[in-house]
Amino acid sequence: MSVVNFYGQLSNTQQFDQIRINIASPDQVRSWSFGEVTKPETINYRTFKPEKDGLFCARIFGPVKDYECLCGKYKRMKNRGITCEKCGVEVTVSRVRRERMGHIELAAPVAHIWFLKSLPSRISTLLDMTMRDVEKILYFENYVVVDPGLSILQKGELLTEEELQKAKDKYGEDAFTASIGAEVIQQMLKELDFSKLKQELYEELQTTSSEVKKKKLVKRLKLVENFLESENKPEWMIMDVLPVIPPEIRPLVMLDGGRFATSDLNELYRRVINRNNRLKKLIESKAPDIIVRNEKRMLQEAVDALFDNGRRGRAAKNANKRPFKSLSDMLKGKQGRFRQNLLGKRVDYSGRSVIVVGPELKLHQCGLPKKMALELFKPFIYSKLELYGIATTIKAAKRMVEAEKSEVWDVLEEVIREHPVLLNRAPTLHRLGIQAFEPLLIEGKAIQLHPLVCAAFNADFDGDQMAVHIPLSIEAQLEARVFMMSTNNILSPANGRPIIVPDKDIVLGLYYLTLAFDNEVGAGMMFSDLAEMEHALYNKFITIHTKIKYRRNQLNAEGKMVPVIIDTTYGRLMVGELLPSNPNIEFKCINKQLTKKDISLVIDLVYRHCGQKATVIFADQLMKLGFKYACSSGISFGMDDMVVPESKSTHINETQLEIKEFEQQYSNGLITYGEKYNKVVDAWSRCTDRVANDMMKEIATPPVNDAPNHQKINAIYMMAISGARGSFQQIKQLGGMRGLMTKSNGQIIQTPIISNFKEGLTEFECFNSANGMRKGQIDTALKTASSGYLTRKLVDVAQDCIITEKDCGTDKGIEVKSVIEGGEVIVPLAEKILGRTAAIDIFHPVTNDLILNKGELINEAKLEQIESAGFDRIMIKSVLTCESTTGICSICYGRDLATGTLVSEGEAIGVIAAQSIGEPGTQLTMRTFHIGGAATKGAEVSSVDASYDAKVKIISRNVVINSEERKIVMSRNCELLLLDNNGNEKARHKIPYGARLLVDDGDMVIKTQKLAEWDPYTIPIITEKSGKVLFKDMVEGISIRDVTDEATGIPSKVIIESKQYSRGAELRPRIQLLDAKGEVITLSNGLEARYYLPVGAVLSVEDGVQISVGDIIARIPKESTTTKDITGGLPRVAELVEARRPKDHAVIAEIDGRVEFGKDYKSKRRIIIHPIDETMSIEYMVPKGKHVVVNEGDFVKKGDLLIDGNPVLQDILKVMGVEVLANYIVNEVQAVYRLQGVKIDDKHIEVIIRQMLQKVEVTDSGGTTLLVGEKIDRHEFDEINEKAMKNGLKPAEAQLILQGITKASLQTRSFISAASFQETTRVLTEAAIAGKVDKLRGLKENVIVGRLVPAGTGYFMDKMRKAAAKLDEENV
């Protein structure tokens, strides 16, 4: 026997490549078993020894103590392998009690509840019965006809007890066979001939036309094919023998006081054994049928409870009325086997303690309490003590450590040197939540943390705790040092910006240090070296803020030192001294008042040009400098620093007058209540902003008096402007006015809070503000959970996304352009393409020089070239178009944001993407507008101004001139472009229907010139011709109603939803225009002038009046159209990645064509689009009350909205394709994060979208075995098609489908990963029937089977292992 096998078998976890799951056959169960369990007893309560043949029997499951049989005849190692003849126990290690199984021979067959009740029920699908019927047979309620024989009964017909008796009386006892219970189901399953059944189903599928029937057939056919492929037998779903899991896995523990705590499984097994034994006795003693049947039913129920308690009927409960935990419950949920023990293990060699700040640490260090280090590094200390001969044995070493002798501390110092430890702060939302540091031993009991890493850990020192873990093996230490050291994690993987950035007081100190004042002592002095300046400072000739001239040596591009004279201050020079010398880093980047943003940019610059080491040193020194001056400046603030502006009362009075006017308009019936509400809220928003701006001006300009200069600047202003603490939002509430508050449902209360915190709130205001504050508090508590859940879903869907090759060689890419909203460039092109790779060769548009090769990385240098060339769009490679079969290639992904270089193979980009999107999720409030409940609703946009001097170009211009000689836009998709001198687009504005155009095509405009204006609160309906108004289908009280406003008593005519009219005709309220002869006027597009009015429209004209071109005949109040709920923050992100249908979604035109309104149907309107080439027209049925944004006769383009709202993602994919869809999702998700000022790189969102687009739906099966409507993995589909084409068959056709992330996770190729995510039982049931094979490609499945993950270093281990296996095969 080899030495290796001496202590039992080595774990063979490394030996397999894939795992397969199947239904166990009865013979297999018997082969696993070491004996039959026949007695329900567990252990003898007097001797505490396991009972023979019971649930803990030592003969079946193995000895209780190592190498000792039960009766004690054989003890110790020498008797290994002997089976005791007295008690029948094999002498071996007690560990076998964790792996040996037993079995129970059932007296009657029993159905496995998973295959019966897990939807869709497999047993009933195969037998083509309903689940209800199968249950009736199994639970002995009805008989089923197995063989109709001579009767006219149908095979498979159900009969009750009475019906059976009648049939027997009618046809005779033996004329037919009917039976009951699991036996008959087993027999029916056995009789199924799958190959024949498959053929029949195929034929039926070809002939049937009913969709419902097709779906049912496809389902059944799929199941039949699964059984054929997996070689499972259907009768195995009914069990004759039940496995008993090893006793150590369902332990029985003795508590103090002689009582026992037992696993629920033992209780459930006992019930099964008891009922089984009773059934055996009843059968032997030939008991009456009805009693036997009842016992069989009870046995079935007992086995059901064991497998999945509570799935059917009432759950079996214990004495405390708590349901038993069955086998299924052991796997399910957060506390189940998968998530509790396989994915989340407790870690040895770890400790946790409170953290305190360690400002004198270096960036790569942390302070570790001595006591803690002694405990954590014990094994290392023991070995060192023994090695040096200080202790003779391990035991002696242990005693020394316990006595804390002085030698021990010396050894500890040595052990700890250069041995990194991992620090982790829960919740670990992204990979920077665990970082490695070199420990320094400190007194006390708290861990010291470097201030600069707080941002990454999201830590503060108000009592946070952190955990310490020790990497033991040399490999682990190496990985900790190379990958996880805090100095190697300077850039954030989410956006590639530095995350080691000074914060809070450091920023304040640096801001104070770099201030410059005009009339300070010694202004304008000249200096040539720092020592001289220090001398002057010490003797009070200058201050740190004095503006002086200084001669500084600067590196030029050739690397020579060149003296330059600069205007600066002593404070700025101190920061300048820390800058590494590099020609690209000029003094001017810090020669200004440094805010947090500036500091971040400087650190980024240093990292890009001088590398990591220089950055770390620079950041560390910057921190020390910042702390020093934050301390010596003594900045603090008092009541007088909160300035209330003089102009506050005037602004408030003006606004109150304005609001009186709105009230007047409302009482005169000129505007609706909703419009009044909008206008009031808007007016107050504007007022608040004005007061705030005035206050800011006052704070920013120091008062002119004789106080020494550096006390002039306002402390609160300094804190906010430098980015150290607080925001202008908060200052506004301190000194301006608090403004509008939101109700708990997100509505804005019309009366604002006029006071600020300095003046104090009135009782009424205080009560009003409590509302919003309470909502904020509750939100915070609730949102954390939903954010965590979103992160978990994202990680799960993307966890197998790994970089597997350098280049997939695809020619595809996506086109990106800058994001423009409201004519402003929000995200410039440069930001979107940095760190991506070019999909094609890119040439300069003027000189035609090659700027970028295909597949070349776009770095900062290339970016400058692209920007100067003036591109407005660029083709880049993307993970969406990557063609790697497993994983993704480096070139399509581009730059690894955490390192700034091309991503390396083995990087787990999926998890990084999920973390990058999920981590800021916790910062996203549910609703996006509270600062202490204050509403920050932006005023509605009601006009467009030119942002540049430019030339106007108007797209789809359709204008009428109204009676006031104004140009009124009549087009639904009018866009106004501003072009520069070269004709490049600088800005693009959407001009709404009904707006007044103030410029025309080809005009030259100057900056800030108004281009167009409109009423933001209503959508008008405007006439294109003059004529006389004729009302049609406007029946008082049925389709139109005089709505009298209760506040004003003024009636206005409003269109209401018309119920079915008495004569059954549908009413379609409309206004027609008649000419002088009384005939309907024809419009320019050849249609009659009639305007359909949606529900809620308010009429602006009377019947029979004369109107002119461009007049408003009705208006739709905006509030009824903006039911586009502002699903803010996280719910919107979740809605997008789950691909849900938005509430009140938009309808998209699928083709280009002309719009026509067809005949209405019930409560739906029919919109028809006729394509230009007069092929098939497309019809849409839309609910009547919805506002249709097109008119009859309008020409729409593919992808235009017919009805307002958020479009359905699946529609975008179907109509516009993948690229447009991806673009839409990326922009929508980014919009949510942008509101919060969170930056995430697009590529992370693209990775998630790629995972949502994994499946295709078969539309034509061709010559393959695929079924129409089947959903299958893209790559599998391609493989099947390749095979078909090789064999000369017609390939199948399919279309891409978009799945939400939950669905995509549950349908991954790996069943282990899917089972550990959600719906464990359903996933495992499906996998077992199909005999699925898990190739162990993703991270999760490998963690579960206990291997290194195939990412990072594990990726190469995996690659080498596979290569080695291949070589072995070849050699053999």
Swiss-Prot record:
Coiled-coil residues: none
Record-listed Zn(2+) 2 binding positions: C808, C882, C889, C892
Subunit description: The RNAP catalytic core consists of 2 alpha, 1 beta, 1 beta' and 1 omega subunit. When a sigma factor is associated with the core the holoenzyme is formed, which can initiate transcription.
Record GO cellular component, one term: DNA-directed RNA polymerase complex
Reported cofactor(s): Mg(2+); Zn(2+)
Protein name: DNA-directed RNA polymerase subunit beta'
Cofactor: record remark: Binds 1 Mg(2+) ion per subunit.
SUPFAM superfamilies: beta and beta-prime subunits of DNA dependent RNA-polymerase (SSF64484)
GO MF annotation, one: zinc ion binding
GO biological process: DNA-templated transcription
Highest taxon of source: Bacteria
Known EC number: 2.7.7.6
Catalytic reaction list: RNA(n) + a ribonucleoside 5'-triphosphate = RNA(n+1) + diphosphate
InterPro entries: DNA-dir_RpoC_beta_prime (IPR045867), DNA-dir_RpoC_beta_prime_bact (IPR012754), RNA_pol_asu (IPR000722), RNA_pol_N (IPR006592), RNA_pol_Rpb1_1 (IPR007080), RNA_pol_Rpb1_3 (IPR007066), RNA_pol_Rpb1_3_sf (IPR042102), RNA_pol_Rpb1_4 (IPR007083)
HAMAP family per UniProt: RNApol_bact_RpoC
The family this protein is said to belong to: Belongs to the RNA polymerase beta' chain family.
Annotated Zn(2+) 1 binding sites: C69, C71, C84, C87
Task performed by this protein: DNA-dependent RNA polymerase catalyzes the transcription of DNA into RNA using the four ribonucleoside triphosphates as substrates.
UniProt binding sites for Mg(2+): D460, D462, D464
Alphabetized UniProt keyword annotations: DNA-directed RNA polymerase, Magnesium, Metal-binding, Nucleotidyltransferase, Transcription, Transferase, Zinc
Species of origin: Rickettsia conorii (strain ATCC VR-613 / Malish 7)
